[in-house]
From Swiss-Prot:
Entry GO CC: endoplasmic reticulum; extracellular region; Golgi apparatus
Locations listed in the record: Secreted
Glycosylated residues in this chain: 164
Phylogenetic lineage: Eukaryota, Metazoa, Chordata, Craniata, Vertebrata
Family: Belongs to the CREG family.
Species in which this protein is naturally found: Mus musculus
InterPro entries given in the database record: CREG, CREG_beta-barrel, Split_barrel_FMN-bd
Annotated signal sequence range: 1-31
Location of region: Disordered: 78-100
Protein keywords: Glycoprotein, Secreted, Signal
Record-given protein name: Protein CREG2
Keyword Signal carried by entry: yes
Record's keyword annotation contains Cell membrane: no
Length: 288
């Protein structure tokens, strides 16, 4: 019989080889998906991580920086695993939070072990008040151009003779001084005493404005010295300022003193210490 008219049987080996060739050609494209006209390799692990990180990382990525059009986002696990592999300069530096108070100063607390006690502060204040021969008196101005504003005057002072400190500053004033006109309307004033004549500033040749030099501020009411204390006021002022005896008499000089109500001491680079009035008058100035 002739086999030319019959259908030729298919060989299993040829079909198997054809399938193997097709699979070999298509196997490199198994890890690719087509999105528009751009393709990239996506594995199952990355696909799962991207799905899980889509809701966690999308919002922070939008809030980080809006200055660039292109934003690079990574899964949370990639940040943790690749931190040690990245150079230090590759991470974007986040701006430091702004300070809440730029010009705020720390107040001195009484619980600090290093801070001196009230008695030491009171002694320093009394020493500074006794050593000072001048100070700046700030009054509330009555001048029409600066009415209600502070007005400062540098005046000679004395808290008593050399060996008799009282802690109360005395003044030798004239009615023609603008500060006196202010005190008639408002007797409240502040007296600032810098440590310009102290031992520390002299020995170390430090400017009086240096924070290491103490500054004392006395606040209270300015009053005229009563007749019974005029003789003591003369001794206090003329013993420290002998030239006052020869000042022109037509200026009608008279004595005033400050009734101290508040004491503030600023020393070193720290804050301001509020010294109780009782401690201030109880303390004694250091001997020179």
């Amino acid at each position: 019989m002739s086999l030319s008219g019959r259908e030729r049987p298919a060989w299993p080996g040829s079909r198997l080889s054809w399938l193997l060739c097709c699979s070999a050609l298509l196997s490199p494209a198994a890890g690719y998906v087509i999105v528009s006209s751009v393709s990239w390799a996506v594995t199952n692990e990355v696909d799962e991580e991207l799905d899980s990180a889509s809701t966690e990382e999308a919002l922070p990525a939008l809030l980080e920086d809006s200055s660039s059009i292109w934003q690079q986002s990574f899964p949370a696990s990639a940040h943790k695993e690749d931190t040690h592999l990245r150079p230090r300069g590759s991470a974007r530096a986040r701006p430091a939070p702004a300070a809440r108070g730029m010009f705020s100063y720390r107040r001195e607390s009484g619980s600090s072990e290093a801070s001196p006690g009230p008695r030491v502060h009171a002694g320093t204040a009394r020493s500074l008040a006794h050593a000072s021969s001048w100070g700046c008196l700030a009054t509330v101005s009555t001048h029409e151009k600066i009415q209600g504003l502070p007005f400062g005057s540098c005046l000679a002072i004395s808290d008593g003779p050399v060996h008799n400190s009282t802690g109360i500053p005395f003044f030798y004033m004239t009615a023609k001084d603008p500060a006196v006109a202010d005190l008639v309307k408002n007797p409240t004033a502040s007296l600032v005493l810098p440590e310009s004549e102290g031992e520390f500033c002299r020995k170390n040749i430090v400017d009086p404005e240096d924070p290491r030099c103490a500054r004392l501020t006395l606040t209270g009411r300015m009053v005229t010295v009563p007749p019974g204390e005029v003789e003591f006021a003369k001794q206090a002022m003329f013993s420290r300022h002998p030239g006052m005896r020869k000042w022109p008499r037509q200026y009608e000089w008279f004595f005033m003193k400050m009734w101290v109500e508040h004491i503030w001491l600023q020393k070193w680079y720290g804050g301001v210490s509020d010294i109780p009035r009782e401690e201030y008058f109880k303390a004694a100035p250091r001997k020179a």
